[in-house]
């Protein structure tokens, strides 16, 4: 199984909550975190199999755009991220999210 990282950045917290909810409901992914960037920008991060992350990000984009005032600013998927990223960036499976891991 090839593990990927998927990210959606929105303007506004309600949009990112809606996106995150839809992402974990639409595919077998694990929500590993979120980052508040500033100026209302928030990024949500999921991990899972490449195809599942792709489906998850698509569902998240659609959901965030349904929120009144919600705006998707950026999305990206990294297939097979280098293991060094996990030790520097907030994309690793933590103890808090391990119970929700889907694979």
UniProtKB/Swiss-Prot annotation:
Q: Which Pfam families match?
A: BMC (PF00936)
**GO terms for molecular function, please?**
structural constituent of carboxysome shell
Which GO terms fall under biological process for this protein?
Answer: carbon fixation; photosynthesis
GO cellular-component terms in the record?
Answer: carboxysome
Listed A to Z, the keywords are:
Bacterial microcompartment, Carbon dioxide fixation, Carboxysome, Photosynthesis
Cellular compartments annotated? Carboxysome
Q: Which domain of life is it from?
A: Bacteria
In this chain the BMC domain maps to 4-90
Output the PANTHER family linked to this UniProt entry. CARBOXYSOME SHELL PROTEIN CCMK4, PROPANEDIOL UTILIZATION PROTEIN PDUA
The record's domain comment reads:
The tight homohexamer forms a pore with an opening of about 5.9 Angstroms in diameter which is positively charged. The C-terminal flexible tail, which is the most variable part of CcmK proteins, seems to be involved in packing of hexamers in layers.
Cited function: One of the shell proteins of the carboxysome, a polyhedral inclusion where RuBisCO (ribulose bisphosphate carboxylase, rbcL-rbcS) is sequestered. The central pore probably regulates metabolite flux. Hexamers make sheets that form the facets of the polyhedral carboxysome.
- Family indicated by similarity: Belongs to the bacterial microcompartments protein family. CcmK subfamily.
Self-association state and partner proteins as the record states: Homohexamer, might also make dodecamers. Interacts with full-length CcmM. Forms mixed heterohexamers of all possible stoichiometries with CcmK1, which might form dodecamers. Only very weak interactions with CcmK3 and CcmK4 were seen.
Q: What is the protein name stated in its UniProt record?
A: Carboxysome shell protein CcmK2
Species of origin: Synechocystis sp. (strain ATCC 27184 / PCC 6803 / Kazusa)
